[in-house]
């Protein structure tokens, strides 16, 4: 059975499932980072990858985005995200689809799709120091695929929740990804998890525009 509840964060309302959902149904570490993207989303076309229940996507919609597409590999999460879109009266603007993000981004590229903002908030690619090399490959690849979909002058909001992916390693990996897809990046904001989560220097959040 589903353990449904409602959460209200500033202007956005969420249906969550505390019984079946990940991390008690809601990722509180990202709560202020979701608010931070709002100032960049007015009239924007936004792609939110690994959207889960749509938290970043809904904040983009509330901020006045022209259109938002949220993507997640879990049909359970996508169904709840679409419920949340209706819950906030955003169903005509904020839509969610079930896809494997790694496979779906090249499909969007092949279709000639471009976005004003691409959000990447993948699950941890490593939970041990021993597998950090594979994690670096994963972050480099997903950021390459995401960057290809950002319009010139647009924004890439990219996140890592891998404890062993420290700031220097992550930024170097993002830089490598940009070089490989011939993009120039400028960091406009660096953010971490909310203050009610223990701060680790290994945990990084970046917001980058690409041209």
Predicted regions and their residues:
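C-terminal catalytic and target-recognition region of SAM-dependent MTase-like enzymes
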Residues: 141, 155-208
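Conserved small/polar residues in nucleotide/adenosyl-binding loops
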Residues: 2-11, 204-210
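Mobile active-site "lid"/loop adjacent to the S-adenosyl-L-methionine
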Residues: 117-145
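Conserved SAM-binding motif I beta-strand of class I
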Residues: 67-72
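SAM-dependent Rossmann-like transferase core, predominantly class I methyltransferases
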Residues: 6-44
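Short glycine-dipeptide loop
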Residues: 150-154
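Conserved SAM-binding loop of SAM-dependent methyltransferases across substrates and taxa
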Residues: 55-64
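S-adenosyl-L-methionine
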Residues: 79-113
């Amino acid at each position: 059975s589903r353990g449904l509840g409602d959460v209200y964060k500033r202007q956005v309302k969420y249906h969550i499932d505390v019984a079946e959902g990940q991390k008690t149904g809601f990722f509180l570490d990202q709560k202020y980072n979701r608010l931070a993207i709002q100032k960049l989303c007015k009239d924007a076309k936004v792609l939110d990858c690994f959207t889960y229940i749509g938290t970043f996507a809904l904040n983009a919609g509330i901020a006045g985005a022209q259109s938002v597409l949220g993507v997640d590999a879990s049909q359970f999460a996508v169904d709840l995200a679409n419920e949340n879109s209706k819950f906030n009266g955003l169903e005509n603007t904020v839509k969610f689809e079930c896809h494997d993000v790694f496979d779906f981004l090249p499909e969007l590229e092949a279709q000639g799709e471009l976005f004003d903002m691409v959000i990447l908030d993948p699950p941890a690619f490593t939970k041990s120091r021993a597998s950090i090399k594979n994690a670096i490959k994963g972050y480099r690849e997903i950021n390459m695929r995401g960057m290809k979909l950002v319009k010139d002058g647009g924004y890439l909001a990219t996140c890592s929740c891998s404890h062993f992916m420290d700031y220097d390693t992550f930024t170097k990996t993002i830089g490598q990804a940009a070089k490989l897809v011939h993009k120039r990046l400028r960091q406009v904001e660096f953010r971490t998890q909310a203050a009610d989560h223990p701060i680790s220097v290994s945990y990084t959040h970046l917001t980058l525009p690409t041209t």
